[in-house]
């Protein structure tokens, strides 16, 4: 768990220099998922998607986090969009 907290601190620092970096926002979301902080993770994935709307890793991450907090309809939309963008990379969303 400590490594995720350390990573989050590094993401915060990196975003001061690159606030429009979708990959960093997405990585922060992944770290929050690992810490089971799903609502915060959704916020970070959504920020990544504001920067880069078709960023498949953020769509899947957001879908997973939304599922974890019971927002299954919204999650389904994220998975659907990801599958439309990258049908060959579609993860199982059930």
What do these predicted regions represent?
Residues 9, 13-16, 46-50, 81-84:
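Conserved structural position within tetratricopeptide repeats
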Residues 34-35, 68:
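Register position in tetratricopeptide repeats
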